[in-house]
Structures are given as structure tokens and as C-alpha cells.
Amino acid sequence: YDSAVTKMVTIHDMLSHHLGTKTFQGDFSFWDSKNSRHEIMYKMRYLKPSGTFRQDFGYCNSCFLTAGEIIPKVTGKPWEVYVYDSLIQPLGMEHTQTLGYGISRMPNAAKPHTTAFAGKLQLLPYDQVDNLGPAGSLLSCVSDLSKWLMMQLDSGRYNGKRIVPWEVLRTTRDMATIISSRKRGDSHFSGYGLGIFETDYHGKQIFWHTGGAFGFVTNTCFVPEENLGITILTNQDNQDFFELLRYQILNAYLKLPFENLSKTVLPGFLDEETREIKKIDGWKDRIKGNTPPLPLKSYTGQYENTLYGTITISEERNNPGNLLIKFNSHQNLLATLQYLDNDEWLLTYNNPAFGVFTTSFLTKNNTVTGIPIKASDFVEFDPYLFIKK
């Protein structure tokens, strides 16, 4: 997007999340999509930064993908093979895979769930994110990740064998992006190294990273001064438990007074969830068979967004009066549009994790010109504007 930044950007920048883009920007186009790694990297030129290069933090999965794609240029091995040969196999992580394809056929694999947008537990399909593999997309388990943590806590060694040079490991922990330098709670600063967050907590330096895919959120943390490593894997993505448990364990090991963090946070979480469900129920109550201001065929056709590509809107065959959106960059993603009133439609994805929202078509002189489309904040925060062809 910015030719000057293109000339200056380095691998270090891509691993530091300070290109100036927003957190998760572009992920609705890339996540669980049919885009190849090459196509994702090409489309990064359309990400308009809202922040300042090398100053503002914005988590960027496509940046990590790009950094990972440098590996085959240097080693001749794809990212997934190089990581397996250099890290997973030497650490004896026997139950860890670098590709997610085929997980649904595994006999002992956790299944993804969510309570988002419904207030009840729902089973989700597995994300297919091998196209974003270098952005931390591993299938693993607590026992295997414990070996990774032991390597981190022993300056790059595992069972006495050098896995990663200490100089390299130490460099990943050097703060590359300042997120905050002001006191907040029990922390005085927070920042990001190369693929790792860091902060102080009750006088100890803490390193951690969370992870997420639809139906899963994880938390891995280590405290070198205490020789402490923590990994938390959960298969329900709409909760704060995976964060609170980390602090509950940290507090216990640091011998801090006990505080029931769940008791403190849960009421506010439940109130927010109740408000969200009430809002969605209110939208659904407005579905009364009203007629939109233009004939249904006026809304059908192809719409385009420069970053995403094309969506196709058609009349839903089995539900007269409804419209169906096909997202052409995604394999199985669909959404229905049900007319409410006052030019407003209810948008509901067939994958519950993508969410439920309202939207309105843009028109000029009784001609449809476009439609804004929103997905869950878990994917991307901002809506996309699709222009009718």
C-alpha cells in the first residue's frame, strides 16, 4: 500500500507486528479461505495502514506467513517441513503436526465449540488454515508444548541438547514494539519481541502468547526467573478462562494472596453476553415478512471488494423473500439476508462463529450500489464494503 514502507520493511518488522496495520486486518479475507500463501502475500498490498510504521502495534497474521515463506527461499524446505525437522522432531513432540489437514479423522482430537452469538454451546467445523501455517498454526497438546517450554527455560536446550542457539532465543525476547509504557494494574510496561509478548508482573519478567482458531483459544507462558512454564489449551472460544487461569497459576507460584479471578470477572462477562443475545433476539423479532423497498432481484448479482474479491448474492430458493450470500474466497461459507424494516437486513452466517449482524444495502437513485459486510471480531474488527458490479 505504501511504496516507502515496502522498500524499508524487514523480516524483523514482520515478526514484530508494527507495520502500522490494525490487529487482524485482512483476516476475514485470509482466514479459513481458499487463498494460497502466495495470494495472501500479494493481497497484503491492499491493507491500508491506520497507524505508523515501526511505532504502532497491530497483530498481523499475514506478516508471520510472509516471514515463514522466506524459509523455503533460504533452506529449500517448506515452512512445515523445516519446523518439523528443526524443532518438533528434536524436541520429541510426537503428537504435534504442522498441518491441520485431516484433523477431523484423528481419533483423539478435541472438537471446537463456541457460545458466541447464541448463548449456548455449539459445535463448530474445524478451520482450514494451512494457508496461514507460519502464523503459529500447529496441532499440539499439553505434553508436547511442555517440552517446548522446557527448552525456553533452559536457554534453548532440551535434555542437555542444544536445539536453538541462546543468542537467537534471547533476540526473540528483546522488545521490538512497545505496546504500553504506563502502569496498568500490576504491570509497568508491555511489549512484543519476535513472536512473543512480554511484561512485568509483581517484579518478575513474564513472556507469553495466546492463540486462537474458531472453537479454540490457548495460552502459553513462561517465567525464566521462576523456571516456570504454563500452557493452557481450551476448546471453547468465547470465554476469559484461558487468560484468568494463567494469572491464577502465576499468583500461586509467586505466593501472592489468593484472589478468585473468575468470581471477579464472570458477572461482567455474563452481563455482556446477555446483552448481546438480547440484541440479536430483538433483531429476529423484527422478521415479520416485510417487503424491502426494491424488488428482490435488484439486490442480486456480484459484488466486489478489492482485498477480499467477489461475493455473489442470489435469491434463496427454499426461503422466498430471503437472499443468500456466497463468499467466493471461502470454501463453504454462506450467509442469509432476511429483511427486517427501514432498509435493514439481518445477516446470519452458516458457520455460527462468524456471527450475526445487521446491514443495509447502499443505493443511489433506486439502484443498489453496494453492501457493507461484518464478521465476528474474533476474525476481524472492521466491516468490508462490497461494490455491486
Identify what each model region corresponds to.
Residues 61-62, 241:
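Short acidic alpha-helix initiation/capping motifs at coil-to-helix transition points
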Residues 40-41, 97, 112-114, 174, ...:
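Alpha-helix boundary/capping detector
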Residues 95-97, 259:
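Short, surface-exposed acidic
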Residues 1-61, 68, 75-78, 85, ...:
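Active-site-proximal loop and beta-strand segments within enzyme catalytic domains
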Residues 72-85, 89, 123-389:
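Catalytic loop of the DD-peptidase/beta-lactamase superfamily, centered on the K-T-G motif
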Residues 7, 63, 141-144:
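An acidic site on a long C-lobe helix of protein kinase domains
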